[in-house]
Amino acid sequence: MDLIEKLAAIEEIKALKARYWRGVDSKDLELLRSVFADEDCEIDMRNPTGPGTGGAVVHDPDAFSKNCLRALADYTTAHHGHNPEIDILSPTEATGNWPMEDRLWLIDGAKGVGFEYLHGWGNYHDRYRKTDKGWKISFTNLQRSRVDKR
């Protein structure tokens, strides 16, 4: 790949990750599911809201997308990724590290999943694969560095 092709791939991957967060925050199941590879996909969300909070490693993007939005249904959410480090390994493979910050607010009158408010920081460690449908997330892992919640 020449420099222009690599830069184009990086921009496509940035847009892909932006769609991931928009899918989560807008509770758009179809959009969220569309960012993941159909085959050989691993979503590692152990300790999603801090150490000791459960979570799982999932290999089914359909199940992950549904369960993610179900868990967040009682919350207004805002997720942001900043200053990604994206490495294009080949014309069809790339990795990315995304510092992130998110906030979750319990909707008035809702039950939630054990907290009213969460403000978190961390990093997403991703792998991407280029498919006939464009770049897709083939692996993602959220590593939390700090979580404040009440």
Segments the model singles out, each with a brief description of its role:
Residues E11, N47, R146:
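Solvent-exposed, flexible loop/coil residues
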Residues L29-D102:
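A solvent-exposed, acidic/Ser-Thr-rich amphipathic alpha-helical stretch
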Residues L3, L7, G55-V58, F115:
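Charge-dense, low-complexity intrinsically disordered segments
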Residues M1-S26, E30-D38:
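Short, low-complexity N-terminal intrinsically disordered segments enriched in polar/charged residues
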